[in-house]
Amino acid sequence: FYFVWQLDFRSRKYPVESFMSPQVADWGKALLLFNNGFPINDYEDADWLAIHGANLFGNDKVSFSERVQWAWDNEDNIVKTAENPLDYTWWTEADKTWQFLGWCFEWYGLLREGWGYYTHLPCAADGSCNGLQHLSAILRDEVGGKATNLIAGDKPSDIYTDVAEKTKRLVEADAEQGHEIARKCLTFGIDRSITKRPVMIVPYSGTQHACREYIQEAIADKIEKKGLENPFGDDLFNVGLYLAGHVWQGINETISSARRVMDYVKVVGTHYADAVKHMEWVTPTNFLVVQPYVNTKKRLIKTHVDGNLVYLSYQQELPDTVNRSRISTGSSPNFIHSLDAAALTMTVNRCLDAKMMDFSMVHDSYGTHSPNMPIMSQLLREAFVDMYEKHDVLQDLRDHAEKVTGDSSIPQPPAKGNLDLQEVLKSEYFFA
């Protein structure tokens, strides 16, 4: 069967089906196979299937060659899992449990049948905090580009670990001054699990308040799931508040360009609000994005249902108004979402030109059959580079805003750095 897809107002793509699709939770994805199969004829064809399995298990911070070797080294575990998953539960240790179990069945099929085995399993390559990849590319930020794998390296860069290390150094400085919470934080440990979600929300107008909440949740999760001793007692709020300040500073040091892009998009949004116009822009795929944010007024309806008096309330949209607050909070994440949607569109078009017809797509995770993954990997890089070399998206945003609002006082975009986007074409771990 085929999935029916729809586009939202930013041109992001979503399957209409909500129960089982390439964009649902782990268990739903685990049920999906491509109708068409492709033969795995040699080790090169099998590489991406091996990489995909390592990624699903959680062994995704090492080089590709180490991930491939991991799959071959675990042949015994995989065979036992595929033959008797109810009794041999090694697979339950995987990060994405159900998809990994499905992968074990596929790898077992390859081991059993050998070269020529027809694979139907979607294999995925994920972006490195994809929103930050776009933000770094927009301003040609070398520091952010290195942290998000826009620049080639022997192993994948991990921005969450980078921010965790910066945070740890700041906390160590406080601990040396006798700061009690800092000392407890160092004893507990500051790693990527603490900083991952705060970093992930940055491209989407995440706040320091949200950062504190995510840090508290991460600490509580480590205590509960890993059985770590809790040195903080009932004081997680103040611990989260303390760490949030340092995590926020670490983020700003790592991806300063991201802040400048988001702040600039918000500035452009204020000019739309001043002109009482809905904010809009045109993406590199020529898709017109319009933010339909208007003010609302609460209305109360009094009616009778089955002899009982019932009050119903609803929000009535007020015509010829714009919601200044929603423009401010929504403009930056919507802008970035529209750009990752454009990159996905351009990638799929290139794949179709290359006669590839099977896709398993999320906005920051592109998938197809293992033998075709090298082709898709090259095409998605070409699409990304082409998009940002041919389109100055901030200048386009500004010029379109002046055209719509008639306001020539909109400031020019911030200056760019020296990142060479051609480096993306050589970066193995841009999508990995």
Task: Report each predicted region and the residues it spans.
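Conserved catalytic core of nucleotide polymerization and phosphodiester-bond processing enzymes
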Residues: 1-432
